[in-house]
Regions:
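Small-residue-biased structural context
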Residues: 1-235
Length: 235
């Protein structure tokens, strides 16, 4: 008697090839993957023009495994406004107002931690100055958006070419991304020493939140809002 061994069929659908997709486009089309991309430090904001393949190679990541991980994530319905004018309002309320409220407190807290723990080997020396730079540069940047660029975007139709002022904002976003790198380095990846006091822990938690917020802020502008006013960029 012959025995036939049934081989189970593979239930895995063919993975979409995301390797050549720019990170910014990936973040836009797969919002459920934003947390994964952030955890792997794949820059989909200012580095959004690089392909997933290039970014994975730079980080020493297995592209096929990365694509499987992305495919396994459940799609999420976007809760973001679809029209640029409404997206501007969302950015103003969710990010501009938040940065203005939180950054001065982080500067104050950094001053306290650096002063009280000046003799500690792991004190984040220079963090107050770095956060003050963030506050100063980001305040000037947001003022320009609020006084010049955003009113223009709310007056004209999507597809209108506003590439020159948008390009200036993109360039400033690149500067902000470098500040994020410096903040991560200054706080040892937001990890306080084991014996850190509550103020020190609160400082690092606040800096981590600010960095995460700024990444999302830049993503919304670079990958969702700005392209609506850069027709030549996609040509």
């Amino acid at each position: 008697m012959s025995h036939v061994v049934d081989t189970p069929e593979c239930s895995c659908a063919a993975l979409p090839d995301l390797g050549e997709m720019p990170l910014g486009e990936l973040a836009r089309s797969h919002p459920q993957a934003l947390g994964l991309l952030r955890s792997l430090r794949l820059d989909y904001c200012c580095g959004g023009a690089r392909s997933l393949r290039e970014a994975a190679a730079e980080r020493g990541l297995d592209l096929q495994q990365l694509q499987r991980d992305i495919a396994a994530l459940q799609p999420q319905a976007s809760e973001l406004p679809q029209q640029p004018a409404q997206l501007v309002d969302h950015i103003l309320q969710r990010f501009h107002a938040t940065h203005r409220a939180e950054l001065p407190e982080l500067v104050r807290l950094a001053h306290k931690v650096e002063r009280v723990h000046a003799g500690h080997a792991q004190v984040p020396r220079g963090l107050e100055e770095l956060l003050q730079r963030c506050l100063d540069e980001l305040s000037q940047h947001m003022d320009k958006e609020e006084q010049i660029l955003f009113p223009m975007m709310q007056r004209v139709a999507p597809g209108t070419n506003l590439q020159p002022p948008v390009a200036r904002m993109r360039a400033e976003h690149n500067d902000h991304a470098q500040l994020l790198v410096e903040l991560r380095r200054a706080t040892d990846d937001f990890r306080p020493p084991a014996e850190a006091c509550n103020s020190w822990r609160a400082l690092y938690a606040g800096v981590a939140k600010f960095c995460d917020d700024l990444v999302q802020h830049i993503h919304l502008e670079n990958n969702l809002l700005f392209p609506a006013f850069e027709p030549a960029r996609g040509a």
